[in-house]
């Protein structure tokens, strides 16, 4: 390991000011930390332009992305198994391809025949989306360089491995290095890269935390497997807001955007029902009508308050505020 020696400037300055580190003669040139300095540019001298966006063809996805995909952007989307991530991206790739943009779908979890069968089930006939069933990073990068797609999907990043590392696919080192190579490729070529990520039992994205810091946008695709409705939200977006949500409905022909999500959050009563009220909440720029239903039974000496979808401590605080300041006693 080469050693650095400290050289003092003339004039007798022996403190930190005036001292510098000098590379000793004979130091190998292969060390990045000893590379020559690069020219710098003042921030005010850099020309900044608005980011151009390309609509994905799915309005609800575009709403969350901020208007569409960005050239050279890297998007990470995670969700539970079977929630519809691959279906969503396959539909988006087909819409982009039909609009005239070349696309590439790299699958590491399914064979080409399985993806083709799913596309036919979704009613995507005659799709010209380029498909590659591969998990080796070097082959994926070579294919991207040859095909030159505008948008490339990697499904999923946990299945990709590099021959430069000896660890197994899905390990922390493999996920970190493969994502870093794909990110550098996207920034240098202007190709939009969408990475599909696995989630843990707790619902967090699997793999190193640096993966979320590395990409430009992090999306979560969530929903109840017993319900046909799905929500997509952004928790990080360098090119747009993070408080927007998109609503989809899973049908036999794939995911369909829900233009009026308030209708699915309200029960259809012909007349007012006791214990039910409707309130308005704002998700990003979209106002939503939601229905709150309360079931109150005669309690014993120590009644319990239970809630579904709302933290019980927050519920207790809200009831205390209503009791103290609004005079609403939510009790027997």
What are these regions (language model features)?
Residues 180-270:
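Phosphate-binding/switch region of NTP-binding enzymes
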């Amino acid at each position: 390991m080469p050693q650095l020696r400290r050289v003092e400037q003339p004039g007798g300055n022996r403190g930190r000011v005036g001292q510098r580190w000098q590379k000793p003669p004979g130091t190998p040139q292969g060390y990045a930390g000893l590379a020559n300095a690069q020219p710098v540019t003042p921030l005010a001298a850099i020309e900044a332009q608005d980011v151009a966006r390309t609509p994905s063809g799915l309005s609800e996805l575009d709403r969350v992305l901020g208007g569409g995909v960005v050239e050279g952007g890297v998007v990470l989307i995670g969700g539970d198994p079977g929630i519809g991530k691959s279906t969503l991206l396959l539909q988006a790739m087909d819409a982009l391809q039909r609009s005239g943009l070349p696309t590439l779908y790299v699958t590491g979890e399914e064979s080409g025949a399985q993806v083709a069968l799913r596309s036919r089930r979704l009613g995507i006939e005659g799709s010209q989306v380029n498909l590659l069933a591969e998990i080796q990073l070097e082959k994926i990068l070579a294919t991207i360089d040859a095909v030159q797609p505008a948008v490339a999907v990697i499904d999923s990043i946990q299945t990709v491995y590099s021959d430069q590392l000896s660890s197994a696919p899905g390990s922390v080192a493999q996920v970190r290095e493969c994502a870093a190579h794909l990110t550098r490729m996207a920034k240098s070529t202007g190709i939009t890269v969408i990475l599909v990520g696995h989630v843990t039992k707790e619902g967090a994205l699997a793999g190193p935390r640096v993966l979320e810091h590395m990409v430009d946008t992090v999306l979560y695709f969530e929903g109840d497997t017993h319900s046909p409705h799905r929500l997509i939200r952004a928790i990080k977006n360098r090119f747009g807001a993070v408080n927007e949500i998109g609503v989809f409905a899973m049908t036999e022909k794939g995911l369909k955007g829900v233009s009026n999500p308030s209708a699915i959050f309200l029960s259809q009563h012909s007349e007012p029902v006791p214990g039910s009220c409707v309130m308005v909440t704002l998700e990003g720029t979209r106002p939503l009508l939601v229905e709150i239903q309360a079931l109150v039974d005669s309690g014993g000496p120590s009644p319990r308050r239970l809630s579904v979808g709302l933290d019980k401590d927050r519920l207790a605080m809200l009831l205390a505020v209503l009791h103290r300041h609004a005079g609403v006693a939510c009790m027997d």
